[in-house]
Amino acid sequence: MSGKLIQRLQDPSRSGAYRVSRVEEVEDAVRGSSLCLVRVAFAHKAVLLNNLASALGFPDWFGHNWDALEDCLTDLSWRDAPGYVLLIESPRPGDDLGILIDILRSSAEFWAGRGKPFFALFVDPARALPLPELFRQS
């Protein structure tokens, strides 16, 4: 599975927001690749923004709001990599989640247009989020 999974994660045309339940398989697939992998918790908006800023090393001008998040996610010049995989744990349905998904989808489209894969993977073992699965359950 990890061979097919890393091929998918390295394909810019498949960039987007997905749900996953098997985090270890994603981590195993990315390990040893040159993709940038970050794992953050989404308890609420402020925690998520702080966690992403820390994990991705956002610059000092990051304003800790949705617009600033999108600005940083579509720049990442300070964290150059051939691709990005964001694992987002503990997502809770609500307005903030919807906004976050929109920003991450937009960022994925931006990077795919530049030939870099960008995946936002929401850890959702209950399959409750309205997102496609990254890979099928066996």
PLM feature segments, named:
Residues 1-56, 60, 76-138:
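N-terminal intrinsically disordered, low-complexity segments enriched in P/E/S/T
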Residues 61-65:
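Alpha-helical transmembrane segments with an aromatic anchor "belt"
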